[in-house]
Amino acid sequence: MRGSPLIRLLATSFLCLLSMVCAQLCRTPCTCPWTPPQCPQGVPLVLDGCGCCKVCARRLTESCEHLHVCEPSQGLVCQPGAGPGGHGAVCLLDEDDGDCEVNGRRYLDGETFKPNCRVLCRCDDGGFTCLPLCSEDVTLPSWDCPRPKRIQVPGKCCPEWVCDQGVTPAIQRSAAQGHQLSALVTPASADAPWPNWSTAWGPCSTTCGLGIATRVSNQNRFCQLEIQRRLCLPRPCLAARSHSSWNSAF
């Protein structure tokens, strides 16, 4: 086939040039200092680009080259021409990596996980979204409960709704298994004014970009409890896919 000898010649020349460059960068035989370098806290030791000596991994936006490699556990790669003014190489996030990190644990793109018993989350393109598993986060309390509140029941993951009458006496009973509270209240008069009541806004459904936060409130024209939603924006999403680390959320 025409052009094949030229292609083979170019490929051979490229391999020879590459081997010469690698020979200049990597010392032969491999010799390393007796004591490994002292890295800053949280920075691991990794093998250099020659696979010879251990060096401190370079972190996000730090300069990098053949011998000083980026931290692979954080999905960082050395990007040439990404330094100031388009010169030099720096460590940036790998755009092809859709994994996410939550509470120090890494999950694959599309993997589902439970950071706690109350939510089910899914790793999605470098971020993650979560759905509530407790019915109290979705189901409203009874309509005849003027001041509902949620209490944490010993031995149970999900809190439960109870009616708080305030100054009005309420009948409470304690279950034998633990101090579970349930209140029986007298229905309020139809002419009595219903006080405004609402829970705090819940966390945003996303870690970056637009999401939805919910709360339970009776602040509407019918003065009835309903689930209200509003848009939320925790932070803008990075142009490159990144690892989401939400260590304080759960």
Curated annotation (Swiss-Prot):
Alphabetical UniProt keywords: Cell adhesion, Disulfide bond, Glycoprotein, Secreted, Signal
CC per GO annotation: cell surface; extracellular matrix; extracellular space; nucleus; plasma membrane; podosome
Pfam families recorded: IGFBP (PF00219), TSP1_CCN (PF19035), VWC (PF00093)
Cellular localization per UniProt: Secreted
Domain TSP type-1: 194-238
Main location: secreted
GO molecular function, one term: integrin binding
SUPFAM superfamilies: FnI-like domain (SSF57603), Growth factor receptor domain (SSF57184), TSP-1 type 1 repeat (SSF82895)
Annotated Gene3D superfamilies: Complement Module, domain 1, Thrombospondin type-1 (TSP1) repeat
Superkingdom per UniProt: Eukaryota
Gene Ontology process terms (BP): cell adhesion; negative regulation of cell population proliferation; positive regulation of cell differentiation; regulation of cell growth; signal transduction
Keyword Chaperone listed: no
Residue intervals of the VWFC domain: 98-164
IGFBP N-terminal domain residues: 24-103
UniProt similarity note: Belongs to the CCN family.
This protein's name: CCN family member 5
Organism of derivation: Rattus norvegicus (Rat)
GN (gene name): Ccn5
